[in-house]
Amino acid sequence: MSEKVIVEPTPEQFGIFWKYLSRPEVTDVDYNGKKLWITDLEQGRYCADEEIPEAFISTFTHSISNCINKQFNNANKILEADTKELRISIIHESAAISGISICIRKSPCFVRNTLKELLDQKYCEQKVLHLLLNCVQAGMNFVFGGEPGAGKTESAKFFMQFIRKEERVITIEDSLEIHYTNINPGADAVELRVGKGFDYTDAIKASLRQNPSWLMLSEARSVEVTSLLEQWSTGVHGFTTIHLDDVRKLPDRILNMENRIYRYVNVAVLIRKTESSDGKVRRYIDQLCFFSRENAENKIYMIVEDGALVSGKIPLDIQKRFNEAGVDEPFVCRHFDRYLREGR
């Protein structure tokens, strides 16, 4: 569990790292004890042509440990900290035999893309965007899957901005990445951070007494999934992310809860990241499905497969949700043109 850095990062504190962290397209800065590796939305992952002095690394780690008042040495091998937009993880050289390891991940307080940019990037077909926007309007429960670094959280953040401001949203995270009050300014929101003495299960149970319309869990892991599905079963809506390589595997990823998945998870979206031979990175919606439990049978309706719209068949219970929300045509979002004009 990371500790929050009290002060905001400065160019002086982050030194060589800041040169890359200050670039909007950079998402990760990783140092493996010898080389500096950069993950860039446009250029992909590359080794930076930088010499990293040992003195700088020593000064940097000492600065971070002071900020969170935590020792970093042979006896305390892990140092983790957050700023408002950075998540920092450091492993001591006594454990990392290749040399001290530093990973810095950026989590910006804004949505990286607009609807127009997603269409230009071929993130998904326009009909799929319409469908997902209508799913938000209808209060569906979403699970965003993908491999680490695929862009699950960024995709979830993008669709969260379309939740109506009067609907109370509670976010639950260990490292602050969603920044809901920033991406949906003026909305009724409560942002919870779990830690010692207040774990995910505690936060989820406490949230139910806070009159939420939506309950957002940054990442679904182990025991907290049970509590999350229990809350979703009460009529609270929500988003979460999970490590996954196929939406059809979701029921198997969450043990002993197969029927609840089909009953209380409505939409699963798989985000895929690919890299071309010239190093260009592309992220896109590879799969989209609806889960449904019909006549005591569990069913999966694949809507998008291999990045292409393959079916327009909507389960009856999902169609009912659309109808109750005033959505007559699931693949046509009546607010889409307005969202485009607003630059969302």
Descriptions of predicted regions:
Residues M1-I16, Y284-R344:
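NTP-binding/hydrolysis catalytic cores, primarily Walker-type P-loop NTPases
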Residues K152:
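Conserved lysine of the Walker
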